[in-house]
Amino acid sequence: ARLILEIIEECRKNVSEDFPIILRISGSERIEGGNSLEEMLYLAPKFEAAGVNMLEVSGGVQYEDMQDIIPSHSKKIGRNVYEASEIKKVVNIPVFVVGKINDIRYAADIVERGLVDGVSLGRPLLADPDLANKFKEGREDDIRPCISCHFGCLARIFQVDMKTMSSKDISCALNPRCGMENHYNITKADVLKKVAVVGGG
């Protein structure tokens, strides 16, 4: 922990007092010999004292199952909420949680109940970039949900284009415009019709 504390202290020395320093941590690495929740409960106040303004709690570690860091459909919703809620009890700075928060009602509930101060969203915003606006407007049923399938987002990161030796462009199994926004501009039809979509295949 000494290295990260020194980094935080140096960052704080070199930025203004109102410049936010946000630290992302694993609430638990969930492997033998890895950082445990107990260790994070000990370290979190030290991070705060060193100058961190907000903690973002993830989980897992890359040496094991990648799907523990970026939970798939087989993992429960709110994979890291318990760890984040416990860490929140020992600090006086905002604590956000990340990791399969793919239901906006669930996200609102854990904030309203005071388990966390906020949620960080990634994949749900690929599925529906207007998610937050739709929720604010009371249009939850119009939200295109992330199903945590990994087919367009995480899987594409690890698919290498052999010509350029770079990751393939990001996409989303539920949002055909994701990563192709400049190519798939949706315009209003000249003639409006009522249509039915049969099947999802």
Please report, for each region that a protein language model flagged, where it lies by residue.
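Flavin-dependent oxidoreductase catalytic cores
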Residues: 1-200
